[in-house]
Amino acid sequence: MNIVVVGLSHKTAPVEIREKLSIQEAKMDEAIAHLKSYPHVEEVAVISTCNRLEIYAVVQETEQGVREICQFLAETGQLQLNRLRRYLFTLLHQDAIRHLLRVAAGLESLVLGEGQILAQVKAAHKLGQQHKGLGRLLDRMFKRAITAGKRVRSETNIGTGAVSISSAAVELAQMKVKDLSNQKIAIIGAGKMSRLLVQHLVSKGAEDITIVNRSERGARDLAKKFPDVDLQLELLPEMLNVVEQADIVFTSTGATEPILDRAKLENLDLHTLILIDISVPLNVAADVEEIAGVRLYNVDALKEVVAQNQASRRKMAEEAEALLEEEVENYIQWWQSLETVPTISSLRSKVESIREQELEKALSRLGAEFEEKHQEVIETLTRGIVNKILHDPMVQLRAQQDIEARRVCLQSLQMLFNLETEEAI
């Protein structure tokens, strides 16, 4: 079995491609079932965020498994595989393990060290378990990645002062208008990203904020989190009226198609309007920029803001790298030790069978008058002897770091004791 990751990210693909390959949580069960239906895919987990879609898998044959995952991605994005391939990356074995740990630690994020990705890795692990995508290898790997992500944030300073996508979006708005306090601001959507937008806007002095949401309940739930802020609440049918009055509009919804485009905006009485779309799939169609006075920015435009933050964080990232290597090594040692399990189990089973047979012979010779408590003593004695004899060889076998040396030992045990073993994971 081999571990692979195939995917794309903000480093390899523009948002116009990433939005085509975004998998909503409601569709994750179908995606995992589809991937598991391929003949060479044994385990699977999916991380889907605004900046990445990554398929982690345990495959029987690396080349065939990777080909099947690429086919799935092409079908999901409704793209020709030849066109899609230039945006994909593939990592195998140790590199795939290291990549997941780097993702969980925030080292692969657009915003170096951002904390939201760890929650997204946890969610991917939970969904993988829930939809029966995970087996022994990926379950352990994701748990190790989550542990590594927590360690990086608690044992290094990489998370200190890190900007998020939401805070970067607010920084971008401030760069464009200087003073947010005199701007009419609208946020379309009332999810977690919108909550963070409100938080950062208020901290930057914004006073006139309107929340537009599909459901009144969602908007009210968001407003309750900011009891000291006078948030205006509107429902989706009022969206265009709100946009017409706004100076800056942030969009952050789960819509799979654009909710704003040129056709909807061109007849509005707009003077100047800044649209900042932090959703993937995109909420705002690119053709709105054909309207005079409208400026559109999507998540890829945030790199301008992030660049100011990155240089000071590089040194912190180096500290995190060393810590992650420890976690990678721990996982690899565990994975390699699985190779010994069938042989050890077979040896213990064979020795235990011999012990039981010989004990039964001895007790039958001693006769029925032999007291039960004495039988228990002999039972305990023989088990103890077996455990003592097997303990050191098993410990040494598991601890052997040299792969070839370990395989020679395994083959020797199998030959000397005539063991029948099942194939290891």
UniProtKB/Swiss-Prot annotation:
Keywords: Chlorophyll biosynthesis, NADP, Oxidoreductase, Porphyrin biosynthesis
InterPro entries: 4pyrrol_synth_GluRdtase (IPR000343), 4pyrrol_synth_GluRdtase_dimer (IPR015896), 4pyrrol_synth_GluRdtase_N (IPR015895), GluRdtase_CS (IPR018214), GluRdtase_dimer_dom_sf (IPR036453), GluRdtase_N_sf (IPR036343), NAD(P)-bd_dom_sf (IPR036291), Shikm_DH/Glu-tRNA_Rdtase (IPR006151)
Site (Important for activity): H99
GO biological process terms on file: chlorophyll biosynthetic process; protoporphyrinogen IX biosynthetic process
EC number(s) per entry: 1.2.1.70
Active site: C50
Molecular-function annotations in GO: glutamyl-tRNA reductase activity; NADP binding
One Pfam family of this chain: GlutR_dimer
Gene3D superfamilies from the UniProt entry: Glutamyl-tRNA reductase, N-terminal domain, NAD(P)-binding Rossmann-like Domain
Binding site residues for NADP(+): G189, A190, G191, K192, M193, S194
PROSITE patterns per record: GLUTR
Written domain comment of the UniProt record: Possesses an unusual extended V-shaped dimeric structure with each monomer consisting of three distinct domains arranged along a curved 'spinal' alpha-helix. The N-terminal catalytic domain specifically recognizes the glutamate moiety of the substrate. The second domain is the NADPH-binding domain, and the third C-terminal domain is responsible for dimerization.
UniProt cross-references to PANTHER family, sorted A to Z: GLUTAMYL-TRNA REDUCTASE 1, CHLOROPLASTIC
Further remark: During catalysis, the active site Cys acts as a nucleophile attacking the alpha-carbonyl group of tRNA-bound glutamate with the formation of a thioester intermediate between enzyme and glutamate, and the concomitant release of tRNA(Glu). The thioester intermediate is finally reduced by direct hydride transfer from NADPH, to form the product GSA.
Subunit structure: Homodimer.
Family under the similarity heading: Belongs to the glutamyl-tRNA reductase family.
Record's protein name: Glutamyl-tRNA reductase
Organism expressing this protein natively: Picosynechococcus sp. (strain ATCC 27264 / PCC 7002 / PR-6)
Highest classification ranks of the organism: Bacteria, Bacillati, Cyanobacteriota, Cyanophyceae, Oscillatoriophycideae
